[in-house]
Amino acid sequence: MTIEDLPDIPLEGSSLIGRYPFLFTGSDTSVIFSISAAPMPSDCEFSFFDPNDASCQEILFDPKTSVSELFAILRQWVPQVQQNIDIIGNEILKRGCNVNDRDGLTDMTLLHYTCKSGAHGIGDVETAVKFAAQLIDLGADASLRSRWTNMNALHYASYFDVPELIRVLLKTSKPKDVDATCSDFNFGTALHIAAHNLCAGAVKTLLELGANPAFRNDKGQIPADVVPDPVDMPLEMADAAAIAKEIKQMLLDSMPLPCTITKATLPNCDITTSKAMLTTLGLKLGDRVVIAGQKVGTLRFCGTTEFASGQWAGIELDEPEGKNNGSVGRVQYFKCAPKYGIFAPLSKITKVKDGRKNITHTPSTKATLHARSQKVDVAHVTSKVNSGLMTSKKENASESTLSLPRSEELKTVAKNDATQPGCISSSSSTSSLDHKQSHPKKLSTSSSSGKKTLSKSPSLPSRASAGLKSSTTSAANNTHREGALRLGERVLVVGQRVGTIKFFGTTNFAPGYWYGIELEKPHGKNDGSVGGVQYFSCSPRYGIFAPPSRVQRLSDSLDTLSEISSNKQNHSYPGFRRSFSTTSASSQKEINRRNAFAK
């Protein structure tokens, strides 16, 4: 039923209640009010309705202002409106609107709007909680859904991260359905919605009030599965990555323990199935495998799991690029060091071929190995410049190291040089370990013996409080492979921001390796710290973190271009966010080539 279905009923004035009280008070059928524009004063200097303004107050309290117009005011997502949800809502009720009537444009009730108005930074939580309690006392139905979004009041409160409203809704609503699903979120629950939107407060409150962390949506995902991966987050969301990690751990810790007694008493057919599948693939536990042609590790587990259906392989990686220590949701499938464990479907793994067990099959590795296989004897040649060639002993050591992938190379170097002063263990960042490889610019010739020696960097302090070891030495004291970025080097971040590398290594806020860059202008997000962990020091808003794929060495042409990009960034249109897509990155490189050619 819509308001248009009512015969010649004026929406303005108090006469509506007197003439047609049966349509509103105590009515079981909710009314959907027609769509209207928000009324604005003729001399208004701003584009939104401000209930604190005198001219706006005249309109708000005018009995001739219709319910449809008041709903239109509620749709304005500005603090001036959302923080006065109770004043505007009471005016709607005064005009005879039923507590469960709906806005014709959004199909939302007053309770839906109230749950939105509790959003931090826009509305006022205390006001929203009081008005929500008032609406529920008047008979507001918390189970009603918007027919546009299929969301009920609990879904809205979870989406906008208002734990105080979640408590009110679940305390007063009957029946208490904390796991009600929503079709717009793959039939996930409020816990799925909160987890997907990184609403830590809502996740914690829902778990406390009995939400099921093992509930699976239509895609078979539990709430922990829908938490965004920090690696996929934009550059500006380094702080959100720490929240994502916290939420996922919170959800995994709350997973129910598996019933191992029942499994122990039943014949385990899964073991037979797993062995048969491994035999078909020509694999066995302990074999070296490659995951999706990228990550290399050792097969430690094969079988069914609690976190997903089907057969899964558990792999202990060579590098800390995994997700766990062999356990998921308090179920230990195999044991390994933290971040060295990962699970993958059997279709994603292949056995490493003999003779290439330690090689990750990447194009760069193949090209490097091909180049190294072509050796020329230049021992009899006397070079006028330092060619970077080492003694036969060093050369043999280098060859054995270079035949390994990056992960094994770091481990071998750390093991061989553990007793040497100034060396760094394998737990240090990749940047600090790159000095183990030979580099022509870092070799010096002794005048007395004519032998070439490799300069070593001094020993480095560790950050025990941060739980990681990062290199703080200057770029001049580190030796890298050719083309690698060094600490202290000026770089360009995502083709726009210019800064200096101050940190490189693993972090607590996201897996993988990250560059910490001190920008030349205050366009950053932090002071070198994220989530209370200090990775490097700089002025506030001068620090930013970026993955290696988004950082490039600053050349002369890039330096000029970065100034142009920086100026454009300062004059970007409001309401639009830059998209750092692959297309824009390739266009950036094209511009660089054109500038270089013009010179």
UniProtKB/Swiss-Prot annotation:
Signal peptide: none annotated. The modification Phosphoserine is found at S557. Residues 468-478 have a biased composition (Polar residues). It holds the Pfam family CAP_GLY. Keywords: ANK repeat, Phosphoprotein, Repeat. Residues 443-462, 576-587 have a biased composition (Low complexity). ANK repeats lie at residues 65-101, 149-180, 186-215. Residues 387-482, 565-599 are annotated as: Disordered. SUPFAM superfamilies: Ankyrin repeat (SSF48403), Cap-Gly domain (SSF74924). Residues 303-345, 505-547 form the CAP-Gly domain. PANTHER family: CAP-GLY DOMAIN-CONTAINING LINKER PROTEIN 4 (PTHR18916:SF32), DYNACTIN 1-RELATED MICROTUBULE-BINDING (PTHR18916). This is CAP-Gly domain-containing linker protein 4. It comes from Rattus norvegicus (Rat).
